[in-house]
Amino acid sequence: MKIFLKNYTGQCVDFFRFGGNYGDSIIWHGTMNLLAELNIRIANVDLLSEKTNEILVIDGGGNFVDYYDDVRNFIIQNHERYKEIIFLPHTIFGNKQIEVLSKLRSNTTIFCREKESGKFVDSFAKSCNVFLWHDCAFYNSFEKSEMGKGILNAFRSDCESILKFIPESNIDISYNGFATKPLNEFLDTISQFEQINTDRLHVAITAVLLGKKVNLYPNSYFKNKAVFDYSLSKFPNINFINQDIF
């Protein structure tokens, strides 16, 4: 993906970053690191913005699925306005995306962050250029933290949870973040612990990069397992736990 993006070195692009939590902030910080390295400048846009540049870059994540509508609504309203559209690594699935994908043209390049999304997009975005690449969270570079003590249970309680019940000791540390929030508090919390149990993908990615022992559990669709298989399985300090625990 970096080789592809080098084509835009020295240029300014319109940049759409949807809202979110600390997981989205990890992605955004990684994206900013990458674009700064490549000397690509951005003009932030939203649903109410005028087009500033001919190229649109949509930040990566898991928003282009049926649970959420930010990316879908933005694309429906804006896809015909741009000379070129680039999706940074995304998870994409669901019936609501099919019609949108089918309308995108050959000026659209979509990076999927795991194979399941790649198959889905290949099936319905027939005119687009589709590639696999890793989540932009991996463009963050964190110093390994000290070992820490104890276990952090950091499970979600929203529509992507499949837990039977939330453990009493749970701290959903991702929930109170937002897409561009500084990472200090998030990193400091994870650093305090030796082991992290979570179904939050970017809690897991962050903890892995910090050198923690990590158990990643499924969410309500294929995202966690698919990203684990494509990107995280190579790390020795993480396991995927495909079973009920609570």
Name each model feature, range by range.
Residues M1-F246:
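Active-site anion-handling motifs in enzyme catalytic cores
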